[in-house]
C-alpha cells in the first residue's frame, strides 16, 4: 500500500553562495549553488488524511474515477486541504456523508464517505481544520476518504495539487 505521511509545514533550506568576481567565475570553479526548492512548494492543497492510497484518479472498471481514495481507520480525522467555505454538508447518493468546500482560488474540494460530517453549510474553515471523520457511508469498499479537486465543474487529478509523498509504496489495487 502507498502510505501517506504528513510533511512538516515549514521546510527551510540554507546555502552559502559564493560572491561573483566581477561577473565571472574563476576557472575550474562550479557555478553557484541555489538553495533547493521544497518539492511541495506552490502546491495549492494539503493532504486531507494520513492513510493508504487505494485508488487513483482516472479510468476505473469501465467508468471514470473523479478523485482519489485514501483508506484509514473509521473515525480518523479528515482535514480541510485549504481554507474555504462549506457549501455542502449532507448525504449524497453514492458519496454517502460528504462535505464540499469552496476555496478563494475558484477550486472546490470534495470529501466523501464520512462516518459523520463535523461542519455545517456556510461555515468557514482553515487549512487543517477537521471537517469530518473517515467512514463507510455511500458506495465504498471499507473505511476510506474519497477526495476530489474541481475547477468549476471539471474534476482535476488531486495528486497534481498535493505535496509529494515520502517513503510511499503503491497499493497493488491501484492502476
Language model segments and positions:
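Catalytic cores of peptidoglycan-degrading enzymes
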Residues: 41-175
Amino acid at each position: 500500500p502507498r502510505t501517506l505521511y504528513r510533511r512538516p509545514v515549514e521546510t527551510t533550506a540554507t546555502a552559502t553562495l559564493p560572491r561573483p568576481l566581477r561577473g565571472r567565475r574563476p576557472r575550474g570553479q562550479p557555478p553557484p549553488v541555489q538553495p533547493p526548492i521544497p518539492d511541495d512548494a506552490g502546491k495549492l492543497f494539503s493532504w486531507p488524511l494520513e492513510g493508504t492510497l487505494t485508488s487513483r484518479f482516472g479510468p476505473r472498471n469501465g467508468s471514470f474515477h473523479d478523485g482519489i481514495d485514501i483508506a484509514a481507520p473509521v473515525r480518523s480525522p479528515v482535514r480541510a486541504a485549504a481554507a474555504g467555505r462549506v457549501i455542502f454538508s449532507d448525504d449524497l447518493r453514492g458519496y454517502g456523508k460528504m462535505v464540499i468546500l469552496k476555496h478563494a482560488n475558484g477550486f472546490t474540494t470534495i470529501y466523501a464517505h464520512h462516518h459523520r460530517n463535523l461542519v455545517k453549510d456556510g461555515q468557514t474553515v482553515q487549512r487543517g481544520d477537521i471537517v469530518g471523520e473517515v467512514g463507510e457511508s455511500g458506495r465504498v469498499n471499507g473505511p476510506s476518504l474519497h477526495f476530489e479537486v474541481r475547477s468549476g465543474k471539471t474534476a482535476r487529478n488531486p495528486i497534481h495539487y498535493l505535496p509529494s509523498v515520502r517513503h510511499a509504496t503503491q497499493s497493488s489495487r491501484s492502476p
